[in-house]
Amino acid sequence: MQVILLERVAKLGQMGDVVKVRDGYARNFLLPQGKALRANDANIKSFEARKAQLEARNLETKKEAEAAAAKLEGQKFVVIRSASDAGALYGSVTPRDAAEAATAGGFSVDKRQVALKAPIKELGLHDVHVILHPEVQATITINVARSAEEAAIQAAGKSIQQLAAEADAAAEFEIAELFDEVGAAASDDE
C-alpha cells in the first residue's frame, strides 16, 4: 500500500514522503496512529494544502521535545528489585518500570517512549534511551539495586558483586589464618 507520511517515521522516511508499506502495517499502525494517509489523488492534494501547517506543528513538538530532552538527559533513577547474590534479578526491569521511575522523578515519560533492546535482568547501572520525538532522544541511567544503600554504592561507581567477592575472599583468608594458627598451636603442643 502506498502512504504519505504525516511525520517522520523511523526506518521508513520523512514527513511528506510517499512510501510503499505492507497493508497490515499501514492499516494497523500508521493510519490509526495518524502517522500516514493513503496515497491517492485526493489525499495528496489535501496533504499539499496542509503541509505548511503540519511542518509548523512538527517543528513545535520537536522544540518541546528538545527542551524536555535537555532536562532529562543524564538523569539517574533508582529501581529497587529483589535479586540473587550473584546479581541476577528475580524478574526484570521493563520499559514500563523505567517510565514509572522517570515519572516518579518528576518527568512525563510514557512506556512507549522507552527504548530497551531487551529487559534488564542484572543489578547495576544501565543506560536507557528515551525517544521523545522521532528526531529527539535522551539517555537516562537506571540504577537497579536491591536496596537504597546498594543503589548509593553503585552510584558511587562500585559493583555490589565485586564488593561481595572481596568480602568473601577476606573471610576465606581469615579462616585460613585461623586454621594456620590452630595447626601451629597443635604442633607446639606435641
Swiss-Prot record:
Record InterPro entries: Ribosomal_bL9, Ribosomal_bL9/RNase_H1_N, Ribosomal_bL9_bac/chp, Ribosomal_bL9_C, Ribosomal_bL9_C_sf, Ribosomal_bL9_N, Ribosomal_bL9_N_sf
Gene3D superfamilies named among the record's database cross-references: Ribosomal protein L9, C-terminal domain, Ribosomal protein L9, N-terminal domain
UniProt GO MF annotations: rRNA binding; structural constituent of ribosome
Top-rank taxon: Bacteria
Keyword annotations from UniProtKB, A to Z: Ribonucleoprotein, Ribosomal protein, RNA-binding, rRNA-binding
GO CC annotation terms, alphabetical: ribonucleoprotein complex; ribosome
GO biological process: translation
KW Ribonucleoprotein (keyword) present: yes
Pfam families in UniProt: Ribosomal_L9_C, Ribosomal_L9_N
HAMAP family documented for this protein: Ribosomal_bL9
Family (UniProt): Belongs to the bacterial ribosomal protein bL9 family.
Biological function: Binds to the 23S rRNA.
Name the record gives this protein: Large ribosomal subunit protein bL9
Native organism: Rhodobacter capsulatus (strain ATCC BAA-309 / NBRC 16581 / SB1003)
